[in-house]
Amino acid sequence: MSRVIFHIDVNSAFLSWSAVKRVMEGGQDLRLVPSVVSGDPGDRRSIISAASMPAKKLGIRAAMPVTMALRICPQLVIVPGDWAWYKRCSEEFIAICRSYSPVLQQFSIDECFIDMSLRCGKRDPVEIATRLKDEIKSRLGFTVNVGVGPNKLLAKMASDFEKPDKVHTLWESEIPSKMWPLGVRDLLWVGKKTEERLIAYGIHTIGDLARLSVGQLTRLVGQKFAAQLHGNANGRDDSPVETEVQEAKSYSAERTFPKDLVDPKDIDRALFNVACIVAHRIRRDDFRASTVSMFVKYKDFSVAQRQTSLDQPTDVTALILNAARRMLAEVWDGVTPLRQVGLGVSKLTHESVLQMSLFEDPKMEYYRDWDRQYDAERARTEDARLLAYERKPNAAGAPATPESTGIPASPGSTAVPVAPAPQSSEPTYVVLREVTAPSESGPLVFRYPDGEKALAAVKMAVRSDPSLRFHRVNLPDGSYSFDLLRDGKVIERHVAHV
C-alpha cells in the first residue's frame, strides 16, 4: 500500500492567532491590514516574528527589525506576542488534526505531519485534506495549508506552495514540474551557507541538484550530506511519521536565560551545558544517538529549529556539541537576542548491539576520557553547582568547551570545519578531580592526583585565554599548586597531591 502523508502548516501562525483573539474581543482583523507581531512593540530594536499578508506584499517579513518595517509602512499595526494564547491555539489545532489520524507527529508549535495511508484508502486525499483545512478554519478561525504527498519531505514541500488556505499535492510524478524549478534554498534542510556553496558551482535549482551524482555532490558538501541532499532533491524520504510514543525515545535538555542573551560566548556556553547534560544521560542509560536536534527561542518567543544525522551513533559530548553548533550557525545571525536554547538526541541504539570501530580517530579516546571525568564528577557531587561546567555565569571562571580543548568535528567528516568557539574573557578550565567552591574572596580550587594533570589543565586555560598567567606554588603540606592569575590576582588554584 502506498503512503499518503499530510503536512498541515498554520498560515502566519502568531499573526493569525493574535488576529483571532482580537476579532473575538471585537477588534479589527489584523490579517486584513499591514500588521506584525513583535516581542516588544514599544522597543524599536525588536524584530518581527510574523507578518500579515498585506504587510508581506509591502516587503515586510519575519526577522526584519521593527524600525525597518516602519520605514516601509509608517501605519503598520504592531502587536505583542501572547505565548499562553498561542499554546492554546496550537493544542486545539493539533487536536483536530489528530481526529483525522492518530499517527501524528508535531513538527513545531504550528505544524504537524499525519499519516493518512489507512484513512484514505481509495478515497481522494485532496478531498479529505480540504475537509480538514475547512474544519480548522470554521472551528478555530484561522487558516492552514495542507501539503499532500507520498512521504514527509514531499508533503512539507507541497504545503509551502501558494498560501494561504490552500491544499497542494506533490506526488512523485509531479516532482519535475512542481519541485525541480524551485531554487535550492526551497529544499528542506538547505540553509544559507549550503545555498551559497551550491550557487557558486552553478547549482541554482532543485532540478540542478537532482541531476548531479552523489559523487559530484560529495566533492561539494561531503559524503554524508551529499547522499541526503541527492535523496531530498529527488523526493526520496523513508522516515516514518513518529507518534508521541516514539518521540519519547529521546533525550533533551534546554536552558532558559534569566535575561535575553546576545553574546556568542554566553550562548555557546549554554549550548555546551545542555550538550553535556544530554550526552551524560544517554551514556548513563547505555545508548548512542544517531540524530541531533536543536532549537533557539528568540526574544519575541519565535522559535527556530534544526535536525541533523550523525555519521554513526555516538554518546560523545564533543560530537553532539559540534553538530549543535553547526545547526546554531544556520538559525542564528549572531546578533538577535535569544531567550532559550535547547538540544535533543534521538534514533537511539543500545550500546550492546554496536560494534567497535577499528578505524576510529585516535583522538576519540581523549574525548571519551573527558566524558568519563565529567560523568564521575556528576556521580560523586550531589550539588551540581560545584561542578565547573554547571556554575552560574557570575562565578569565578567560565566552563571549558570541547572546542576550546581542540575537539574537531566528527571523525572522518568531510563537512565544513567548525569554527573555534568564541573565546571568553574569563578563564577556561577542565575538571579532572575534585572541585571546591570559592569563598567570597578566594579562588576556585581544583585538586588532582598528580602534577601532570594539573599542569595540563592550566596550560589549556592559558592557551584558551592569553590574558591569563600561571606560576607554581609549594604548599606547606608538601603538595604544590599551579595558580592561574589575571592582572596579578589568583582566580583559580590547581592543586597537585603528591
PLM regions: where:
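Short beta-strand
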Residues: 104-108, 286-287, 472
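Short, mixed-charge low-complexity intrinsically disordered segments
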Residues: 462-498
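Gly/Gly-Pro- and Ser/Thr-rich, intrinsically disordered tail segments characteristic of DNA damage-repair
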Residues: 1-228, 234, 360-398, 402-420
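Conserved aromatic
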Residues: 63, 203, 261, 445-452
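Short aromatic-glycine-(Arg/Gly/Cys) micro-motifs in beta-strand/loop hairpins
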Residues: 422-442
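A short, charged, amphipathic alpha-helix used as a generic interaction element across diverse proteins
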Residues: 438, 449-471
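DNA-contacting surface of Y-family translesion DNA polymerases
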Residues: 5, 186, 196-338, 347-362
